[in-house]
Amino acid sequence: TNGMLIDEDVIDFADRQMSNVVLSLDGRKEIHDRLRVDYKGNGSYDAIVPKFKRLVESRGGKDYYIRGTFTHANPDFTKDVFHMADLGFTQLSMEPVVAAEGDPAALTSEDIEIVKQQYEILAQDMLRRQREGRPITFYHYMLDLEHGPCIYKRISGCGSGTEYMAVTPWGELYPCHQFVGDEKYSMGDIWKGVTNKEVQDEFKCCNAYAREGCKDCWAKLYCSGGCAANAYHATGSITGIYEYGCDLFKKRIECAIMMKVSEASE
């Protein structure tokens, strides 16, 4: 949720019915308000942060994530992660933007190098916070080296289009929310079920071994071939290679492994 319509009824419903809640916040006020605006064009930071604090406080330990997107405007995204932590939030995620080449928000090759450095800064700071007894969780560094996903899950990934689908308010079915509105990937509706079997079959074959460039990659069983939607929007094919995404994913896994090694040696 972007938070604008959160009230006590929403908070109560989320506490009773939702095992996890994802709250959209891009970090520092000036960063968040660049793109997250209300219908009048005003930034939403001041309106939503108090609501997010109230919702998180009410959950009493249930899962939540404060989740943001960083763009060309803030490749120094760790400042935004630390800002969220300073607000009192401890379960955090920041995702790189996926945008068409030439889009003002798109990450450049120069940005990618900055972002890689930022991932290292974040990992080191998380270790420091952990030693000080005030840990934070960063979604992309959650790595279980002993009891991780089964091999089927490692190969198939998120299961979009096969194990789950997105349902629009009008009852239409799509492989996931990022394909909503693209009629090529309309799968059917809740009344008739899945009628476009070709799309479902296409997604069944979208896995860690479907991409030629993944076959010799050391990280393929961590990413399961990556996000089909990101690949599609970047290359035009759900089995394409979104190279920026690959580079950043591998850097995140490197940092997550480094943290595990550091924790084991302490």
Residue ranges and their predicted role:
Residues 1-97:
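Radical SAM/AdoMet-radical enzyme domain recognition
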Residues 170-172, 209-266:
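Radical SAM enzyme core and accessory elements
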Residues 150-155:
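Short, flexible cytosolic linker that couples an ABC transmembrane/permease module to its adjacent nucleotide-binding
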Residues 24, 67, 95, 139-141, ...:
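Generic beta-strand/beta-sheet core signal
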Residues 158-161:
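Short, small/polar residue-rich loop motifs at catalytic or cofactor-binding pockets
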Residues 30-35, 91-113, 135-149, 178-186:
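Flexible glycine/acidic-rich beta-alpha junction loops that bind and position SAM and/or redox cofactors
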Residues 114-147, 177-224:
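C-terminal accessory region of radical SAM enzymes
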